[in-house]
Amino acid sequence: MNMTDCSVGSNPLAQLNKHAQGQGSSLSNTHVRHSGGVSGSNVFRSGQNVVSEDGRQQLNSFMSQPMRLGEDKMHPATPMGSSMGNAIGGSMMQVDDSSMRSAGDSQWTREFRQNTAGKTNMAQEMGSSGAAMANSNAWKFRYSPMTNVNNTAPLRPFNNIIRQKERANGLETGDIAWNDKFDELEKEVSDKLNFKDGETVEKMDTGAEMQQDNLETGDSTDYQKEFQEVWDSIQQDTEEMLSYKDDYEDMLNDTDFERSFLGKRAVESLEYKFENPSENQYMNNPNAYQIGCILMENGAKLSEAALAFEAAIKQDPKHVDAWLKLGIVQIQNEKELNGMSALETCLKLDPNNLEAMKNLAISYINEGYDMSAYNMLNRWADTKYPGFYNSAELEGKRDEHENIHSKMTRRFLSLVNRINSVDPDIQLCLGLLFYANDEFDRTIDCFQAALKVNPNDELMWNRLGASLANSNRSEEAIQAYHRALQLKPSFVRARYNLAVSSMNIGCYKEAAEHLLTALSMHDVEGEFEVQSTRSNSISSADKYSFSGFKPTDNLLETLKRVFISMGRDDLLDRVRPGMDLSQFRNEFTF
């Protein structure tokens, strides 16, 4: 055991502690278990080792015996008063000294036998003294004995160490009055601790009196002042919260907030931006609309068809079909915002145009205007199937906006169950609802059902590819995009999606070729020649300013990422709006 933490100078207990710490290295490494917060390597350590020759022989004889430490048991720590008296007075003294008798009746052995009775008395007196000290709260450390009476060998060196150190210091243990020394030490420690406790209590009483005096004098005023400040702050926070509630209700009633926060698009905020009329070769052609339709049907460049429809609209701003075709073409040509504006204008002119509603719902979902998409789908269903259900429920309280999706889904599922045949448009709308909720597997099922009815719908093949890509099924998505391009080679959006899926599987060269092909489809005949004759003050970044949206932004940024993935910094430096695409034809096929 180690009692150095409780020593008080040069007293008998400190001397006894030094005796007990002898032979630390040898004993700590011979499996003597201990507890009480002492490190294993420093339990028994002494700077002096005095052992007689006879004693060394006895010690070697003892150390040669096997130790069955597997049977040792560690017991919970107990107070010093009870554990020391019982452990030392009881277990410690049940020592089988047959091994020492077998080594010969040496002087060392005779002295050990003579002092056994003395040690017994010492242990008993230590137990009684320790109990007294424990009752006075003098010591709070704990001692854990090993109580395996069948294996007492580890206790023998402990007794021998004490005896050897007593001889080295010239102590005669048989004549030492241990009880007197412990009584003296107990009185000394108790007096000191009682003095400190009394001093602490006195200081606490003094502090309490000072605190009471301060409260009765000036500090009470400061306390009340601080309390009033805290109370006023709480009242102010409450008033602010009430005002925030009113502001929040006003904000919910505000149209702009409804559009932004609830996923609604500000329809009137974006008008369609026409290309420069002076560059439109169809501007004065009376058959511009028919030309645009022919270009669409024959797979011509979508940019060419868009110019034809723009010319038709300039000639007749209320040309509903021209607005519809223009919106569809621009969306397919990767010009989503302009396409949405054209479709919204179409609905202003013809509120019941089902094709415009359907395509607008798709664009709203693509751009994140989910609430506008739900309302548009509801409007489409109410127009196509009037009286089927009460659409006014969706126009109810705004705090139920998160439930609109589930309501819309249930209604379209009910609509599917009531119609005997498969309606591709209903499957499309239902698939859009699943798509908006990231349920891509169910979306795929809806789109595949629609394709069974109309397998040559390139738009549906592209939508199926997007759903497959979002389900991490890039290989299947590529097949769907290829099918869409087989049906319509000028489908820029499908080609762009194909490039992205190719990137996802590491086919960077193929992705670059698809993107370069899509960029080449944005060029219309004579566009760059006309732009090159414009003033030098117009930068290349302004070449698409007339549309309000640079159509090549997505394509160019994606192409840059492809070149970065390929490690082609030399090609990366060439990518810019209005670049000459022929510079890439030596390495890429498009």
Curated annotation (Swiss-Prot):
Chain positions of TPR repeats: 285-319, 320-353, 424-457, 459-491, 493-525
Keyword Protein transport appears in the UniProt entry: yes
WxxxF/Y motif 1, short sequence motif: residues: 108-112
Skewed-composition ranges (Polar residues): 18-30
Extent of motif WxxxF/Y motif 2: 139-143
Pfam families per the UniProt record, alphabetical: TPR_16
GO molecular function, one term: protein-macromolecule adaptor activity
InterPro entries per the UniProt record, alphabetical: PEX5/PEX5L (IPR024111), TPR-like_helical_dom_sf (IPR011990), TPR_rpt (IPR019734)
Gene Ontology CC terms, in alphabetical order: cytosol; peroxisomal importomer complex; peroxisomal matrix; peroxisomal membrane; peroxisome
SUPFAM superfamilies per record: TPR-like (SSF48452)
Recorded coiled-coil stretches: none
Entry comment on modification after translation: Monoubiquitinated at Cys-6 by PEX2 during PEX5 passage through the retrotranslocation channel: monoubiquitination acts as a signal for PEX5 extraction and is required for proper export from peroxisomes and recycling. When PEX5 recycling is compromised, polyubiquitinated at Lys-18 by PEX10 during its passage through the retrotranslocation channel, leading to its degradation.
Signal peptide: none
Region ranges (Amphipathic helix 4 (AH4)): 227-243
Chain segments carrying region Amphipathic helix 1 (AH1): 7-29
Segments for region (Amphipathic helix 2 (AH2)): 56-74
Record carries keyword Ubl conjugation: yes
GO BP: any one term: protein import into peroxisome matrix, docking
Site of covalent link Glycyl lysine isopeptide (Lys-Gly) (interchain with G-Cter in ubiquitin): K18
Renumbered residue ranges of the record's region Disordered: 18-45
Sorted UniProt keywords: Cytoplasm, Isopeptide bond, Peroxisome, Protein transport, Repeat, Thioester bond, TPR repeat, Translocation, Transport, Ubl conjugation
Function: Receptor that mediates peroxisomal import of proteins containing a C-terminal PTS1-type tripeptide peroxisomal targeting signal (SKL-type). Binds to cargo proteins containing a PTS1 peroxisomal targeting signal in the cytosol, and translocates them into the peroxisome matrix by passing through the PEX13-PEX14 docking complex along with cargo proteins. PEX5 receptor is then retrotranslocated into the cytosol, leading to release of bound cargo in the peroxisome matrix, and reset for a subsequent peroxisome import cycle.
Domain notes: The TPR repeats mediate interaction with proteins containing a C-terminal PTS1-type tripeptide peroxisomal targeting signal (SKL-type). The WxxxF/Y motifs mediate interaction with PEX14, promoting association with the PEX13-PEX14 docking complex.
Protein's UniProt name: Peroxisomal targeting signal receptor
Lineage: Eukaryota, Fungi, Dikarya, Ascomycota, Saccharomycotina
